[in-house]
Amino acid sequence: MTTRPDDSKQDHLTGTSIIREPGPPPREISSRDYAARLLAAPAALVQLSLVEAKIVVSYMRPEKVDAGVTFITEGDADNTGFMVLLLDGEVLVESITVSRTTPVTITVLGPGSLIGEMGILDTGPRSASCTASSNIQCAVLTREALESLIAEQPGIGAKFLLAVSARIAERYRDTQKKLKLFARLASTMQQELNRKQ
């Protein structure tokens, strides 16, 4: 993993403020083994073996983000070149829905969560905002590092992409189920309102 310069106060990929400590370069987040175990866990990409996850992690770099910093912004189409494996801390995922001006909390993510994987694959605008609700430590995989992984370790790169795609498909199916449930709830509520009139 590459280390960050201590004098910078912003991450060049996300434009967010990053915790910088004076002195020698920051140590790796915990260890590559810890990050690999999180990456290969059921909460992330269970399809990867621990050995494969260690190879993927070797293409990531450690980052720290201050509590309160929004490091992914919904609708941002310019800042999609990375994904994050959360190692420590919590991230609040929010979205602004139609006809609302304040964001709705979608979920709170903890260690082992993958964040931003859709953007790294399709370069489309970010679908939600992600804010560190505590100081977080994470491993960042850039699009350039992903391309290097695919070129240098094509089998593992392909397996990683399939695992990420399966995870996105799983979340899509879950979202569809929730939308159907909300549609039934809205229909029931409308019927109740119509009956009272």
Regions found by a protein language model. Name each.
Residues 1-197:
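Cytosolic regulatory regions built on CNB/CRP/Popeye-like sensor folds
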